[in-house]
Amino acid sequence: MNAVYLDNNATTRVDPAAVSAMLPFFTEQFGNASSMHAFGAEVGGALHTARRQLQALLGAEFDHEIVYTAGGTESDNTAILSALETQAGRNEIVTSAVEHPAVLALCAWLEKTRGTRVHYIGVDARGRLDIDAYRRALSPRTAIASIMWANNETGTIFPVETLAAVAHEAGALFHTDAVQAVGKIPMNLRHSEIDMLSLSGHKLHAPKGIGALYVRRGVRLRPLIRGGHQERGRRAGTENVPGIIGLGVAAELARHHIDEENTRVRALRDRLEQGLLERIGNAWVTGDTENRLPNTANVAFEFIEGEAILLLMNKAGIAASSGSACTSGSLEPSHVLRAMHVPYTAAHGAIRFSFSRENTDADVDRVLDVMPGIIAKLREMSPFWDGAAAAKSGFAPTYA
């Protein structure tokens, strides 16, 4: 039995082409790019090529608008903390209630330790941002608005260009966590109002431990990590050369295949959703089904726990993720689904299936074969499930 991996929003397999490109930089071209000798110059040239590859994927105007980091979390932290330092007289942040913890945890820390005021903008039942509330929250005191490009759990896409323009009307900077969007949504940042953008290599078939922060030319950036002069003095530390090379190759592959792969992956995702809803009652798709990432399906199965579903899926050789998280011994639904007002009976049983270019029709077939039995087995054990009553109820979620 072949394993089925449908957790690509968590991480992706490194593309073999990226691995091949990286290998020489471990044992042959191992110089420090800051060194004056030939070993350093050789590495420096390779880094320049990789930077241009990422620039092309982002549609950035200048390659020096890219600052390499260790990943999305560092990029998010750098952008927000820098804005608070460079935007004189401004000490407020506007963000959404459904951001990644890389943003939300930082905001909570800033509230507690620095007295920063943070406005958390809500979403509707489909995960769409309340634009009017966003506009009202912005003021001359706002240093930065940070809104993700696409949600990691539901795939819902946010209108970041509109949000950036509105932020600028208030004199604030605009940052977007685009970790889930880069490589899945075509970008043209040279014609964008986005000031800063975070990305992470391991979400697009590059290695873990490498990411980047796009900083639009003219936007001041205070480094989070201080030391040497690397990245034009904006991020100290010897460059992760193999990681940067791998990210460059992955970016090049994504740019060349984004349209065809989006079409193919969307078809797989849609077939999975349709098949699950046809085979399993009291289940539905969460998020904005008309405006979301092509690879992401978040399906809520009512009256059972996501953790239990995942355990049985894992035994069947299928990897996905749950909308629930176990924290300090108490099971709580995802903060994203709570913000969307998904009923607890469904939010606890939400499963995210996230595809990549490596997935096939056979993967979908396997999930459709296995999932009905898993859900039926768990519902039989659930004290909240009355199959006969549910079948007669004609249940449909009123919040969708």
UniProtKB/Swiss-Prot annotation:
The modification N6-(pyridoxal phosphate)lysine is found at K203. Keywords: Iron, Iron-sulfur, Metal-binding, Nitrogen fixation, Pyridoxal phosphate, Transferase. GO terms for molecular function: cysteine desulfurase activity; iron-sulfur cluster binding; metal ion binding; pyridoxal phosphate binding. It comes from the Bacteria. GO terms for biological process: amino acid metabolic process; nitrogen fixation. The keyword Transferase applies. InterPro entries: Aminotrans_V_dom (IPR000192), Aminotrans_V_PyrdxlP_BS (IPR020578), Cys_deSase_NifS_bac/arc (IPR017772), Cysteine_dSase (IPR016454), PyrdxlP-dep_Trfase (IPR015424), PyrdxlP-dep_Trfase_major (IPR015421), PyrdxlP-dep_Trfase_small (IPR015422). Its cofactor is pyridoxal 5'-phosphate. Disulfide bonds: none annotated. Pyridoxal 5'-phosphate binds at G72, T73, N152, Q180, S200, G201, H202, T238. It holds the Pfam family Aminotran_5. The active site is at C326. It catalyses: (sulfur carrier)-H + L-cysteine = (sulfur carrier)-SH + L-alanine. It is an enzyme of class 2 (transferase). The keyword Iron-sulfur applies. Its EC number is 2.8.1.7. [2Fe-2S] cluster binds at C326. Homodimer. NCBIfam families: FeS_nifS (TIGR03402). Catalyzes the removal of elemental sulfur atoms from cysteine to produce alanine. Seems to participate in the biosynthesis of the nitrogenase metalloclusters by providing the inorganic sulfur required for the Fe-S core formation. Belongs to the class-V pyridoxal-phosphate-dependent aminotransferase family. NifS/IscS subfamily. This is Cysteine desulfurase. It comes from Gluconacetobacter diazotrophicus (strain ATCC 49037 / DSM 5601 / CCUG 37298 / CIP 103539 / LMG 7603 / PAl5). The lineage of its organism: Bacteria, Pseudomonadati, Pseudomonadota, Alphaproteobacteria, Acetobacterales.
